Amino acid sequence: MGRQRHTTTDEALKLVWESADPINRPVVTGTYFISKENERSLMAPYPAVFNWVDGDEYKIAYVHPLPANALIRVGTAGFGFVLMHRNAVAQMRKVHGATTYFNETGVGEQFVSEDINFFRLMYKAGVPLYTHTGATVKHMKRFALDVEYYKFFWEKDERP
């Protein structure tokens, strides 16, 4: 996998910071976007914010469409923009012991990436996760600037 970068702003950080609370909202993420179509010229963006499907800890669904500028409770998220109070990890240790929390797990249909697995373990420990949809950051990914992108950009409307 190529190098990934997230760029933030003071405004996004302030929204996440002001939304956090050591007891009620010990973990708050901002929002960035990902795509399942990384090799295509024009990637369809989806928020890296998910809810569990039918309580299954290995099945997730995008929170899409994304509510505008809202603080919402979610099941899991990407790990690119996270503010976490140390109480969250203390609670995880009470439930899971001293183990590795940031690793991939499962195979096939039960494969989950390291960020989703971290939040899965956090969820199982009873630590709530919130996302602020107004605290958006750029997720720098590789994509081609080619004719498909050109057509999409310029034929979208009749710009001079």
Locations of regions flagged by a protein language model:
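C-terminal catalytic/acceptor-binding lobe
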Residues: 86-87, 91-160
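Conserved catalytic core of nucleotide-sugar-dependent glycosyltransferases
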Residues: 6-103
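Active-site acidic Asp-centered loop
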Residues: 1-4
